[in-house]
Amino acid sequence: MIVIGRSIVHPYIMNENEPFAAEKQQFLSIMTGNQEVYSFRTAAELSFDLNVRMHIITSALELFQSGFQFRTFVTSFCNEEYWQRTALGGFQLRPGVSSSIAIRDIFKNGKMYGTECATAMIIIFYKALLELYDEEMFNHLFANLLLYTWDYDRDLKLITKTAGDIVPGDLVYFKNPQVNPASIEWQGENAIYLGNSFYYGHGVGVKTKEQIIYLLNDRRIPSAFISAYLTDFITRIDSRIMSQYASHTPPQTSLGFIPIRDDAIVATIGHTTTIY
């Protein structure tokens, strides 16, 4: 269900010729049909949400095709022209380097980088926002970047919740409870849902849910009897906050709305929204 202000609506893409119009319409159809309430203050916030989801997906595929390597923090490596490898295996932006240039370099020269899956997901989020922000704004928000697991910049606002409905562009987590300690890096897999039953996980590539579970199960202890599984954790960019920094070039997605109800009482506790 999609709510704009206090109105329950069925949005649609007005310009069928805009980039990725069909994919964005699919996002809207999924969100409209889900039980979860997707609440936005304005149409511009919803437009941003659609575009950031699309850029998360395209950035995930770009990273997959870049040659970016899977490594543990012990063996991680980076392009030293833009980043300094920390003692813990993270990547610290070099002084005087623009974060926008350094993030783009990861996608341009992926073979010069290697790290684990959580860091890769945060890199994808940064790249998606870079596509929607002026470089000056991006560099201001994300100066002095550190890429290291979930230690992301304080200006990157994310929402993590449970029991929601998965929409393309969401980050999900596969858990492997009986992982072999000899390959502890396979205790789970962070993955971007690409839509149409496919996910991208750094280290596993583009796979279905069943294929990712199969790969994780293959890395369990010999006597394992509990299968890996897709958890109900969902992580998203907080479009209500992050949309305020977006550039208006390129233009926002043009949306039309079919009104369903305009007197909804909207109650939000944490990241869960309920309609009365």
Swiss-Prot record:
Provide the leader sequence positions: none
Instruction: Name the EC number(s).
Output: 2.3.2.13
- Example GO molecular function: protein-glutamine gamma-glutamyltransferase activity
UniProt keyword terms in alphabetical order:
Acyltransferase, Sporulation, Transferase
> Which biological processes are named by the entry's GO terms?
sporulation resulting in formation of a cellular spore
Annotated catalysed reactions: L-glutaminyl-[protein] + L-lysyl-[protein] = [protein]-L-lysyl-N(6)-5-L-glutamyl-[protein] + NH4(+)
InterPro entries per record: Gln_gamma-glutamylTfrase_bac
Does the record's keyword annotation contain Acyltransferase? yes
UniProt keyword Transferase present? yes
Q: What Pfam families is this protein classified in?
A: TGL
Recorded family membership: Belongs to the bacillus TGase family.
Q: What does this protein do?
A: Probably plays a role in the assembly of the spore coat proteins by catalyzing epsilon-(gamma-glutamyl)lysine cross-links.
Q: Any idea what this protein is called? A: Protein-glutamine gamma-glutamyltransferase
Q: Which gene encodes it?
A: tgl
